[in-house]
């Protein structure tokens, strides 16, 4: 909702249910989704992604699922991210199933935007969606030419809620009990060891 504006173009990789949902989200934002399709149960093919990037040099994002919940298959986040960056695109990664369950190095691999859920490998109660945007993605959000279509999902407002560069503002009531659950789950991951949890 934040990294693509009406009239924008994004490459969306589909190898299961949640790749299809990414396509729908791009289109709901008024963008054009260039589809890279792979069979269910197969990872996203980086060669197909590269071909789409070459055929559509005016695209701004590549969106894909790290670990497709509907099949359990994992795609090569590091390689796809590198390809996208080589073509001037940002990546949006759905890691709802992958976070903590398999290797994921958000900063080292320079992932621009990523989201997850607390209810999968984090083993915390449902209700929170951990997200991360790097500085490049945050700057793109701040420099949008149009408002994000959803007030609730507008990260400019949420960054103000976090007191980032703006005066602190009220955006929502945080689900405190879920935050306590997430805190405990993270303590358990730390106790086990992150790399051990990938095994």
Show which residues each predicted segment covers.
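Active-site phosphate-binding strand-loop segment of PLP-dependent enzymes
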Residues: 43-100, 113, 121
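Active-site C-terminal subdomain of aminotransferase-like
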Residues: 119-198
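Conserved active-site segment immediately N-terminal to the catalytic lysine
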Residues: 106-119
């Amino acid at each position: 909702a934040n990294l693509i504006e009406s009239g924008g173009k994004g490459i969306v990789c589909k190898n299961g249910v949640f790749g299809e949902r990414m396509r729908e989200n791009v289109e709901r934002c008024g963008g054009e989704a260039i589809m890279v399709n792979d069979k269910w149960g197969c990872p996203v093919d980086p060669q197909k992604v590269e071909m789409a990037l070459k055929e559509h040099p005016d695209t701004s994002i590549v969106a894909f699922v790290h670990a497709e919940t509907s099949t359990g298959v994992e795609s090569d986040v590091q390689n796809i991210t590198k390809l996208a960056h080589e073509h001037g695109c940002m990546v949006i990664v759905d890691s709802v199933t992958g976070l903590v369950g398999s290797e994921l190095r958000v900063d080292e691999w320079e992932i621009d935007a990523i989201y997850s859920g607390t209810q999968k490998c984090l083993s915390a109660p449902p209700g929170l969606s951990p997200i991360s945007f790097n500085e490049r993605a945050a700057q793109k959000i701040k420099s949008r030419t149009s408002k994000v279509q959803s007030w609730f999902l507008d990260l400019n407002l949420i960054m103000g809620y976090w007191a980032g560069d703006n005066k602190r503002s009220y955006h929502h009531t945080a689900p405190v009990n879920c935050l306590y659950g997430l805190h405990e789950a993270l303590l358990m991951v730390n106790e086990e060891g992150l790399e051990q949890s990938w095994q």
